[in-house]
């Protein structure tokens, strides 16, 4: 609660920053209020374009995620001086994406493709060696010699001693395969683990330790009434850290793709997550009350196949989710809205009167053998393999959702744009969205198209709820992996992407794209699993590679002709988290955090001297 009021106090300054000229630094209030910030997978999928006016922005201050994005994107302009007094950040040459540290999480450990670490910053105005941390799940079965989740602190160059150090590491009694989510103050973690083959929600309070490691974690599965250990749901709120509580999903399903999405709105304390049986679950009392799964009409029936990670939009009241294609029943590759609040109830989108728990699905967006249920007919091949569909990106301000499909059933990779308003005139039952944009060829072997990201032209667009800018995505899933730019004009998506350049000389999978803006440079980061780009700056021959590109800072600017920086990584990377929250002044850096897909390591890499 204290951190919420800190964020609320910060919003006036943050809103002022939003309309400040880029060329003139804005100083925060002299009396410094500590603002903590959590960043996890969900902040990549729920975004906000710039509101149309100051007054509209002030109305958005009731949405904690909007404020978090303001802080995350504007904090580089709030440094209290222009020096680097502690030597935290060292200038590096342009093009040098330096691996600051890598840590083994155990043999075979990985976050997994399309999954993310989670970062907590104790104070967005300064680095904190003791309290800033980044958490990784390992994707391995927990045991006395293998952590299922591990966090690192002492993260930064200049912290002294061992960089980093293990902050805490736990044997939680299961296998965590999807991204974790953090409470707003960073003191708790929520995640899904497979426990005896069944999906289980875990809510955990951590405690810093000097003795735990990836190979010697603390076992907190022993039954307890007060902690440390596993406590009942009723005893969780009062338990002493480290402690956790577990809730088995209703129906005993599995969950291999869906990560939990937490609603930070005051008074909500609700979390949503999907399962492999096509149901969407709601949990209440997660970080502030008594954790419990909601009953009827939850879990909501969306489909009969695996769900992606859900994204809740507080404006429309809908939870948006995608379904992956499953060949066993010729189903999936759809986008769906599930009504979660009274805001979306009572209308008819072609499937009867919507109530809380009602799902409104699109037609099939990918390959299928049944043309009558598909947006593009049976088209090209690809209907004989399963196809994962990533979680959508939702721009709550603009009222649009973006869905990324590696095969649209007609021979192309595609990005679909949908309205977040569910009714017969916008997103209707069994519709195909407002626009379909193609980004190269479509995979017939099940290579997914992971989510892209918008550039700062889009995020800072002055056109309010009708933003103009660009969406970058790594497509061409049936050929050499290729970076594309998709133009968005007044909230309308172009129907085809502009080819930027090939990022691999092979038919390989890209990671999601992650954008990071500074006062003078807008960068995007992505990785390929093999045969990375060979132009300047070149990736190691034949290897997986993470790379950055300098993208135009103005509409219609010159597209990059090569990478800005590269780093060889084993088998490519997970999703990438950007840490733009430490601002020493004119010397600043972008930390990126990720895991390798085959090298068993957690990595922090930095690129400084951006100005």
Language-model segment annotations:
Residues 1-4:
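Positively charged n-region of N-terminal signal peptides that target proteins for export
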Residues 29-36:
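Cleaved targeting-peptide boundary
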Residues 8-20:
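Bacterial N-terminal signal peptides
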Residues 19-28:
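Sec/Tat signal peptide C-region and signal peptidase I cleavage site
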Residues 31, 54, 63, 69-611:
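Mobile, glycine-rich extracellular loop/lid and propeptide segments
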């Amino acid at each position: 609660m204290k951190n919420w009021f800190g964020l609320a106090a910060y919003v006036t300054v943050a809103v002022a920053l939003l309309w400040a000229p880029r060329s003139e630094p804005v100083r925060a209030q002299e009396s410094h209020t500590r603002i903590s910030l959590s960043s996890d997978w969900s902040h990549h999928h729920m975004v906000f374009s710039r509101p149309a006016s100051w007054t509209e922005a002030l109305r958005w201050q009731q949405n904690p995620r909007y404020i978090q994005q303001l802080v995350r994107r504007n904090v580089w302009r709030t440094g209290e001086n222009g020096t680097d007094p502690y030597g935290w950040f060292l200038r590096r040459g342009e093009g040098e994406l330096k691996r600051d540290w890598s840590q083994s999480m155990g043999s075979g450990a990985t976050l997994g493709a399309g999954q993310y670490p989670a970062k907590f910053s104790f104070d967005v105005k300064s680095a904190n060696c003791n309290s800033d941390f980044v958490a990784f799940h390992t994707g391995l079965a927990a045991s006395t010699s293998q952590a299922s989740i591990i966090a690192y602190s002492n993260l930064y160059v200049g912290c002294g001693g061992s960089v980093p150090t293990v902050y805490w590491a736990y044997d939680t009694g299961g296998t965590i395969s999807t991204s974790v989510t953090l409470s707003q103050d960073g003191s708790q973690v929520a995640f899904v683990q497979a426990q005896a083959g069944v999906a289980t929600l875990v809510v955990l309070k951590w405690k810093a330790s000097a003795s735990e490691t990836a190979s010697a974690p603390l076992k907190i599965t022993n039954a307890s009434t007060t902690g440390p250990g596993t406590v009942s749901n009723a005893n969780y709120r009062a338990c002493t850290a480290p402690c956790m509580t577990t809730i088995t999903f209703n129906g005993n399903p599995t969950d291999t793709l869906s990560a939990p999405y937490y609603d930070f709105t005051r008074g909500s304390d609700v979390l949503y997550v999907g399962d492999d049986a096509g149901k969407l679950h709601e949990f209440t009392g997660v970080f502030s009350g008594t954790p419990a799964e909601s009953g009827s009409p939850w879990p909501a029936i969306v489909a009969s196949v695996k769900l992606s990670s859900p994204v809740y939009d507080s404006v429309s009241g809908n939870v948006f989710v995608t379904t992956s294609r499953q060949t066993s029943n010729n189903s999936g590759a759809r986008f769906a809205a599930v009504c979660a609040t009274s805001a979306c109830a009572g209308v008819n989108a072609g499937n009867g009167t919507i109530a809380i728990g009602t799902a409104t699905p699109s037609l099939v967006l990918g390959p299928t053998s049944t043309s009558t249920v598909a947006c593009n007919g049976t088209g090209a091949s690809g209907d004989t393999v399963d196809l994962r569909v990533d979680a959508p990106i939702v721009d709550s301000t603009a009222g649009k959702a973006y869905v990324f499909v590696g095969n649209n059933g007609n021979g192309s990779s595609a990005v679909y744009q949908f309205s977040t308003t569910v009714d017969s005139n916008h997103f209707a039952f069994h519709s195909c969205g407002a626009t379909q944009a193609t980004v190269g060829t479509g995979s017939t072997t099940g290579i997914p198209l992971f989510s892209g990201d918008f550039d700062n032209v889009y995020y800072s667009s002055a056109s309010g709820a009708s933003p103009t800018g660009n969406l970058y995505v790594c497509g061409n899933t049936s050929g050499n992996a290729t970076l594309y730019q998709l133009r968005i004009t007044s909230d309308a998506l172009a129907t085809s992407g502009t080819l930027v350049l090939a990022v691999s000389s092979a038919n390989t999978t890209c990671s999601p794209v992650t954008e990071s803006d500074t006062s003078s440079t807008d960068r995007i980061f992505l990785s390929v699993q093999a045969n990375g780009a060979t132009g300047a700056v070149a990736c190691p021959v034949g290897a997986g590679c993470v790379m950055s590109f300098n993208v135009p800072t103005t509409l219609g600017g010159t597209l990059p002709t090569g990478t800005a920086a590269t780093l060889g990584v084993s088998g490519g990377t997970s999703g990438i988290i950007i840490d733009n929250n430490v601002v020493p002044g004119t010397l600043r850096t972008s930390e990126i955090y990720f895991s390798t897909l085959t090298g068993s390591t957690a990595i922090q890499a930095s690129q400084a001297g951006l100005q």
